[in-house]
Amino acid sequence: MNSGTPPPSPSGPPPPPAPQPQARARLNATASLEQDKIEPPRAPRPQADPSAGRSAGEAAAPEPRAPQTGSREETDRAGPMKADVEIPFEEVLEKAKAGDPKAQTEVGKHYLRLANDADEELNSCSAVAWLILAAKQGRREAVKLLRRCLADRKGITSENEAEVKQLSSETDLERAVRKAALVMYWKLNPKKKKQVAVSELLENVGQVNEQDGGAQPGPVPKSLQKQRRMLERLVSSESKNYIALDDFVELTKKYAKGIIPTNLFLQDEDEDEDELAGKSPEDLPLRQKVVKYPLHAIMEIKEYLIDVASKAGMHWLSTIVPTHHINALIFFFIISNLTIDFFAFFIPLVVFYLSFVSMVICTLKVFQDSKAWENFRTLTDLLLRFEPNLDVEQAEVNFGWNHLEPYIHFLLSVVFVIFSFPLASKDCIPCSELAVISTFFTVTSYMSLSSSAEPYTRRALVTEVAAGLLSLLPTVPVDWRFLKVLGQTFFTVPVGHFIILNVSLPCLLYVYLFYLFFRMAQLRNFKGTYCYLVPYLVCFMWCELSVVILLQSTGLGLVRASIGYFLFLFALPILVAGLALMGTVQFARWFLSLDLTKIMVTTVICGVPLLFRWWTKANFSVMGMVKSLTKSSMVKLILVWLTAILLFCWFYVYRSEGMKVYNSTLTWQQYGFLCGPRAWKETNMARTQILCSHLEGHRVTWTGRFKYVRVTEIDNSAESAINMLPFFLGDWMRCLYGEAYPSCSSGNTSTAEEELCRLKQLAKHPCHIKKFDRYKFEITVGMPFGTNGNRGHEEDDITKDIVLRASSEFKDVLLNLRQGSLIEFSTILEGRLGSKWPVFELKAISCLNCMTQLSPARRHVKIEQDWRSTVHGALKFAFDFFFFPFLSAA
């Protein structure tokens, strides 16, 4: 195997068994390899001509281009050339030291052959070291040999294992990018330094675009200008002051894979800006900061004064005042005074607006990524000049895969918008304005799409818009009978129990639209799913949302939202003055119609937690808070909060009862026979309770005799909070938020006022806040008498009585009932069935023999939100949003 190996010295070929010259040559080569591992190529021996060494080094700098165009052919011809012409090993070694990747590969193969005969460990390590250098220049044969060495654990040490694994795992795309990046780096570094300053690289950017014959006369083409600006931003995006070869190669590889440095987006492309462009306000001198950022300077001075004034005194105050407990108490006090109806109104609106804002933010991020796409294509065009074998299609696929995050967040935001829109109050949603915004983003998102799938995206958008307009025709107030027929459903076909197929012209258009979706996904061997289809879904969702919101809009609102806001830009000064004047008048009228003192006190109370938070943190900074918010991902924060809100509300949906029918055939007499005193006497109460537990869940409507009602609990969180205040402040708050006791004058005609005036002398305070009381009642109901009106012993048995729990909403009804009134009530059998005086929750009540009708209605039903039907309606709306007019939910 060693017979073909040339001797390391020119004295003559030694016999193959002689190991000493070979070992000496291996050691010399290894030592020179370690010295020149990072250095650019140069002559390794001191007796060589320096000029020759320099020419060899400079010739080796663009050497990676040679294996780019004909690397495969050279590899295929390597065998025959060796057979025909024997090249001395010293000459191959000199070429390898000069940076020739082919020679480095041959030296590595030579040491691998030597490792089979003697000194396996030393020769294998030398071979791996040479193969690493060749693989770094994109030599495919060297990569294959490294993979074999890694599999056989030949020459693999703890120092080179990580590098060998990285080079062995590189794809063809990464290897091509590496070869092109090597050529660019040596053009940017003509002096062949180990590390180059960023400023020096920026000065040499122009040399990359120069042809072999030097700079071409005439204007520079726009494509070359874009490539030059792209290369400048790529170099200056590195945070280091000096860039080595490996750093530049890794940076280029990451960009080619779609991993873009964050500060690359923040760089300005305008080359004519002054030296202060791009600097933050903190980096500017005080004079320029005041001139350029006056608000920031004022805020910074205010923060400094607050910090100086508060650090000394507020530090010890924050240690003795339980601020967190106070914040929690005030928070729970506010929450305890809110009702379920308020949450049912407020939460869908919050979810809708937050998710809509998230959609807008994600769309803007998509627009930013479209700019990144343009820069990426500029870089690939630049790399193609140095590596024609670069797989641009695979590079674009990798870039698209690594930039799917804003699209995923956008689709999640769409889900929240779809589910919250049918639940939210349309009176609090500016549908016309949102429809115009949705239409605007439909057009702009389409314009930001890639041109690679333009035939499909253009046809898909036209089809979608046509289907949407045809679906809107039946709702147009104008009498266009012939046109409305185009949007009407011809007939429907049930598909299962929950889905209906609508046969219409828009339905056919949607079938064609789904076909176009499939064609877009089919591009590039179904890699077009995330390269073309997912980006187009942004345009699709905005278009669908605009159609849905247009159904809730008015013609006047659309005119106001489109033409009015366009004219608003031209009449901005006059409109601002008019709006300010109108707002001032309305604000003054609002204050005159309400109690000014009450509003101010309420505002102060609600702001207490915020004030405590600000003043107890000695190191609090407004600008720091703003910076932290800008650094965090607002979209992720919104999505996390929306998910938490929906999970919290899901428990109410799961437990909701709604307006269900209380029509069980179980009568009170049957219940008393099975679970009453007779059953207790036959067996015992425990056995009866176990047996009657099978009746749990029955929704019954029974008739009984009202015996009495009592208050079991009075909840007044406002009074509890006021009682903790000093006496004089508490009385003032009671009179501010409550009512004064009436005086006992002859003009009082109300019974309630007469009762209160008698308590005025006995009350501890001049005012009361009983209007905030919330009551819980217990009603005792007995079995009705017989049909003849006679009272039987069993019917008057108090052990058969049942107890009904009632909430504060039944207060007016219960206070008007009298003992012996015949009432009809609805409840659910649950709890201690089969025991004495079982307690059920009152769901509905009506009086059957009252002389006057109960106020405000004859039958009073417990207000319960039918959350399940509401969620069912939201699911139906979501299904129709995606599939109507092709399919619709039953």
Curated annotation (Swiss-Prot):
Residues 1-83, 208-227 are annotated as: Disordered. Participates in the regulation of cellular Ca(2+) homeostasis, at least partly, by modulating the filling state of the endoplasmic reticulum Ca(2+) store. Negatively regulates the ER stress response and positively regulates the stability of V-ATPase subunits ATP6V1A and ATP1B1 by preventing their degradation through an unknown proteasome-independent mechanism. The keyword Lipid biosynthesis does not apply. This is Wolframin. The modification Phosphothreonine is found at T30. The chain crosses the membrane at residues 314-334, 340-360, 402-422, 427-447, 465-485, 496-516, 529-549, 563-583, 589-609, 632-652, 870-890. The gene is Wfs1. It is a multi-pass membrane protein. Its main location: endoplasmic reticulum.
